[in-house]
């Protein structure tokens, strides 16, 4: 009977160890849970960026205003008949 109780105690101890510290145990669960939260935050940021890109793509496909704005700001282009004026501030000496 003592041997049976000893075996059951050892089995219970082994099961508790694997539950708390073993593969797919509680410690792994909490680690994976924190990894999931971090990945969800990254995914949210990427979804927001993708939404902005889709909106810009739609704007470029449908209207000439966005194309004109990009040409003016990124390429420095002007419309025919426009004059470009640059105002330079004074440097402190």
UniProtKB/Swiss-Prot annotation:
Belongs to the FtsB family. One of its GO terms (biological process) is FtsZ-dependent cytokinesis. It is a single-pass type II membrane protein. It comes from Vibrio vulnificus (strain YJ016). This is Cell division protein FtsB. Residues 1-3 are cytoplasmic. The keyword Cell inner membrane applies. GO terms for cellular component: cell division site; cell septum; plasma membrane. Residues 42-75 form a coiled coil. Keywords: Cell cycle, Cell division, Cell inner membrane, Cell membrane, Coiled coil, Membrane, Transmembrane, Transmembrane helix. It holds the Pfam family DivIC. Essential cell division protein. May link together the upstream cell division proteins, which are predominantly cytoplasmic, with the downstream cell division proteins, which are predominantly periplasmic. The chain crosses the membrane at residues 4-21. The gene is ftsB. InterPro entries: Cell_div_FtsB, FtsL/DivIC. NCBIfam families: PRK00888.1. Residues 22-93 are periplasmic. PANTHER family: CELL DIVISION PROTEIN FTSB (PTHR37485:SF1). It is found in: Cell inner membrane. Part of a complex composed of FtsB, FtsL and FtsQ.
């Amino acid at each position: 009977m003592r041997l049976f109780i000893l075996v059951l105690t050892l089995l219970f101890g082994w099961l508790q160890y694997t539950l708390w510290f073993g593969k797919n145990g509680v410690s792994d669960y909490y680690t994976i849970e924190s990894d999931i939260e971090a990945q969800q935050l990254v995914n949210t940021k990427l979804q927001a960026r993708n939404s902005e890109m889709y909106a810009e793509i739609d704007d470029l496909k449908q209207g000439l205003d966005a194309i004109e704005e990009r040409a003016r700001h990124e390429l420095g282009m002007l419309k025919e008949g426009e004059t470009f004026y640059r105002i330079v501030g004074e440097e402190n000496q």
